[in-house]
């Protein structure tokens, strides 16, 4: 039983590598200004070719090598967007692993290097030059002349170039294509072309001078019925301060709300269409599931920032031989088995909510959703489910295969089997435990999909 589940997972994961697995390309997504990563020579768009002489095929390969070389210097060969190759020496530091299901307590990281890139959505200051040219908060810049734009850093590069060369470019026309919300329910977007000339940027020094803002502090959504809605916060409002704290990053918004003392309402200063307003908001305690399955109870006011991330560049990797597929399939099966064991341990320790236990409805929905995403996602889901069944069957619960193994171990230790009566009692206890687990899974499915809790 369990061994067939294990072997099936190896087969499925190996099949994925034979068909060709789509994974993130080894490309630097974003580099924070004035960070260690920038000072060491990394730039957004750089392609990572090798680390300490080891070739890199995917970003996952790069992350594994960072993990292996924590608190050390590494030699990295990169290819910049202009196709020029460079040799860089990078300092790798340690970071506490955010994945609580991993066996590794720390991972390798480079300060200022981001694995995701913000999309080219802009905030626009009311009454600014950018506003007068026709740009609006929430516009997503998708193209500048014939160049496709897929991330914020490309927008910065283009505008800074125009500002620096405004006089020499004179009246050169520039066509900027944006996507903008076009309906009342904000589900559809219209494509708009805005034409400008380079010399219109001659008197400015930075993008901020033109009137463009990073979108981080603008609101994308105000949750219905939330304290924010009751205080009349609206989409595209920009948060300026909370109490006496001037807000520069979204993390400050979260931290100030989470640290609410439960007494006086928070004074939230916002800018709406150029007008400064102060709203009194009393946060409320909400419970929500994190991406890692932990139940997080904290103060919230019901707002989401206008931050979206660009789709990463993908690369399709195919195993060169059958033996490589088997090796990779086995390695991934072992990795996921380890994570599954850790998830069970965290569940019993109470670090992961029991609400994550799902039954047939959850399994069916996962299979359906993954199938709609493509054959690779579907096969990956089947492999993960097979590993879960493998681990579940090995739990030392009578009725399951793991329970039988547990009895055999007892027999070896004692030198004789348990009595029939003790076996019957153990089987009954195991049956009750298994039924309880099934009822809990079914209950979670119904509350999640039918009662939306």
Language-model region placement:
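Internal alpha-helical transmembrane segments
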Residues: 1-30, 82, 118, 123, ...
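Functional transmembrane alpha-helices
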Residues: 105-134, 140, 165-170, 175-179, ...
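Short, conserved catalytic or interaction motifs in soluble domains
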Residues: 53, 146, 244, 402, ...
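Short extracytoplasmic/periplasmic juxtamembrane "stem" segments immediately C-terminal to an N-terminal membrane anchor
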Residues: 27-49
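Interdomain regulatory linker/hinge segments that flank or connect interaction modules
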Residues: 2-9, 51-103, 144-203, 270-274
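Short helix-capping/hinge motifs at transmembrane helix termini and TM-loop junctions
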Residues: 12, 16-21, 349-350, 372, ...
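Transmembrane helix boundary and interhelical junction motifs in multipass membrane proteins
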Residues: 395-405
């Amino acid at each position: 039983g369990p061994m067939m589940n294990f072997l099936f997972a190896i087969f499925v994961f190996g099949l994925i590598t034979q068909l060709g697995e789509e994974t993130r390309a080894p490309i630097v997504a974003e580099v924070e200004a004035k960070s260690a990563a920038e000072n060491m020579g990394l730039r957004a768009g750089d392609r990572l070719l090798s680390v300490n002489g080891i070739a890199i095929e995917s970003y996952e390969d790069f992350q594994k090598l960072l993990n292996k070389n924590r608190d050390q210097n590494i030699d990295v060969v990169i290819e910049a967007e202009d196709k020029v190759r460079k040799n860089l020496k990078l300092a790798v530091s340690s970071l506490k692993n955010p994945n609580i299901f991993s066996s590794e307590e720390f991972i390798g990281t480079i300060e200022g290097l981001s694995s995701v890139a913000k999309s080219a959505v802009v905030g626009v200051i009311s009454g600014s030059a950018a506003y007068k040219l026709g740009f609006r908060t929430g516009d997503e810049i998708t193209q500048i002349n014939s160049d496709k734009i897929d991330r914020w850093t490309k927008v910065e590069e283009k505008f800074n170039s125009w500002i620096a060369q405004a006089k020499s470019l004179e009246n050169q026309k520039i066509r900027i294509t944006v996507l903008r919300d076009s309906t009342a329910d904000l589900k559809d977007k219209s494509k708009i072309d805005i034409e400008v000339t380079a010399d219109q940027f001659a008197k400015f020094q930075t993008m901020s001078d033109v009137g463009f803002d990073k979108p981080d502090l603008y609101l994308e959504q105000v949750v219905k019925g939330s304290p924010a809605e009751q205080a009349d916060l609206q989409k595209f409002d920009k948060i300026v301060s909370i109490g006496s704290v001037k807000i520069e990053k979204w993390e400050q918004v979260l931290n100030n709300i989470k640290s609410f003392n439960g007494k006086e309402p928070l004074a939230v200063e916002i800018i709406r269409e150029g007008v400064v307003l102060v709203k009194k908001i009393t946060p409320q305690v909400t419970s929500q599931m994190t991406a890692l399955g932990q139940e997080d109870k904290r103060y919230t006011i019901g707002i989401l920032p206008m931050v979206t991330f660009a789709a990463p560049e993908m690369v399709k990797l195919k195993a060169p031989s059958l033996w490589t597929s088997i090796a990779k399939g086995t390695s991934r099966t072992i990795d996921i088995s380890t994570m599954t064991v850790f998830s069970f341990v965290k569940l019993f320790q109470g670090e992961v909510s029991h609400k994550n236990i799902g039954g047939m409805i959850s399994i069916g929905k996962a299979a359906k959703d993954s199938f709609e995403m493509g054959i690779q996602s579907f096969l990956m889901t089947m492999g993960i489910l097979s590993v879960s069944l493998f681990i579940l069957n090995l739990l030392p619960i009578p009725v399951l295969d793991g329970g039988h193994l547990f009895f055999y171990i007892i027999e070896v230790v004692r030198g004789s089997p348990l009595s029939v009566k003790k076996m019957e009692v153990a089987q009954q206890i195991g049956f009750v435990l298994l039924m309880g687990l099934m009822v809990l899974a079914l209950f979670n499915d119904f509350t999640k999909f039918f009662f939306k809790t």
